[in-house]
Amino acid sequence: MTNIRKTHPLMKIVNGSFIDLPAPSNISSWWNFGSLLGICLILQILTGLFLAMHYTSDTMTAFSSVTHICRDVNYGWLIRYLHANGASMFFICLFIHVGRGLYYGSYMFMETWNIGVILLFAVMATAFMGYVLPWGQMSFWGATVITNLLSAIPYIGTDLVEWIWGGFSVDKATLTRFFAFHFILPFIIAALAGVHLLFLHETGSNNPSGLSSDTDKIPFHPYYTIKDILGALILILALSSLVLFSPDLLGDPDNYIPANPLNTPPHIKPEWYFLFAYAILRSIPNKLGGVLALVFSILILALMPFLHTSKQRSMMFRPISQCLFWLLVADLLTLTWIGGQPVEHPFVIIGQLASILYFTLILILMPLASLMENNLLKW
C-alpha cells in the first residue's frame, strides 16, 4: 500500500514541499532565512490578531487602546512587543534573504525573484501602515510626511494624497483605512509567499557554488527540517531577548507622546529598517527626484537579472565582485546611520555620497567587475 503522505491530495502537496523535496546537499545557513521569514509572518499574524481584538482604530482612542493593551490585557505587553520587535526581526531576515540572493545569483530564477520583490514592497507597505496605528507623534508625522511624497506626482499628486487621506489631512479616515489595510495585507503576503515557493519548486533551490546540483540531491526531511528548527530556535531566542530585556531599543521615544497635529517633532524619522531608503530620499533636494530615487532604490532589485554580466552565477569564485558586494553592504549600513541623523553638515554630504555609491555600485561597478572577471578566466 502506498503511503497516505504520497497519495492524499493535501498531504501530497506538503510532502512535495517539505518532506520528499529534493534539495542540494550543500546549501548553507544563508538558506535558512526563507523558513525564518515564514515563521516571522505566522508570528506577526497571530500576535496582530490578538492585538486587533483590543485595539480601536479611532483617533480619540487609538493611543489609549494601545496603553490599555500594555497595562490591562493579560500578557498584552508581551503580545504588543512581540509584534513590534517581530517586525524588526522580519526585516533583518528579509535583508539577509535578499542579500543572499544577490551574492549567490538566486535572482536568475526570474519568476521567484520578481515575486520576492513584490513581497518586499508589500511587507514595507504593511510595516509602514502598522507604525501609524499606535497614533503617537512619530506615527502621525511619519504618515503625514510619507503620504505627502505622493503629491510630487505631476498633475494627479494632490488629488491622490487627499484621496488616500480621506480628507485634507491625516485624520480619523486615514487611521481607519490604514488599520483595514494593515490587517488584510499579511494574508495577501502569505498567499504571495505560497506563489514564491511554487515558482521556487519549479526550478529547485540554488546553492552556494551556483552550479547545477541535480547530481547530488538529498531529501528535505530530516536534513533541512532539523536545520530550519535550529534556525527557528536562534530566531526565537534573539526575539525573546529583545522583547524581554530591551523592548523599546529599536523604537522611537516620541511615539510615547500622543499624536498632536499642532506640534512637529524635531526629527521625523521612520523605523530603523526604512532609514536607508529615507536617507536616499533626503539626499536629493528635489521632491519628485527624491521620491523616484526612493522607489528606484528598491525597484533596482528587479533589474538584477539584466545586470548580471558574469559567466558564473554565484560570487563564490569571484573575489572582485565579493569586495564590491561587501562595499554595498557597508554603504547600506552607512545610509541607515545617516537616515537617523539630522539634516545638517556633514551628514547631508555623507548621505549624498552614499546614495551615489549605492546606485553606482549596482548599475555600473558590479557589472563591470563581472566582465573583468570573465576576462581573468582566460588567463
UniProtKB/Swiss-Prot annotation:
Pfam families: Cytochrom_B_C, Cytochrome_B. InterPro entries: Cyt_b/b6_C, Cyt_b/b6_C_sf, Cyt_b/b6_N, Cytb/b6-like_sf, Cytochrome_b, Cytochrome_b_C_euk/bac, Cytochrome_b_N_euk/bac, Di-haem_cyt_TM. Binds 2 heme b groups non-covalently. It is a multi-pass membrane protein. It is found in: Mitochondrion inner membrane. Heme 1 (or BL or b562) is low-potential and absorbs at about 562 nm, and heme 2 (or BH or b566) is high-potential and absorbs at about 566 nm. Belongs to the cytochrome b family. Component of the ubiquinol-cytochrome c reductase complex (complex III or cytochrome b-c1 complex) that is part of the mitochondrial respiratory chain. The b-c1 complex mediates electron transfer from ubiquinol to cytochrome c. Contributes to the generation of a proton gradient across the mitochondrial membrane that is then used for ATP synthesis. This is Cytochrome b. It comes from Oreoscaptor mizura. The lineage of its organism: Eukaryota, Metazoa, Chordata, Craniata, Vertebrata.
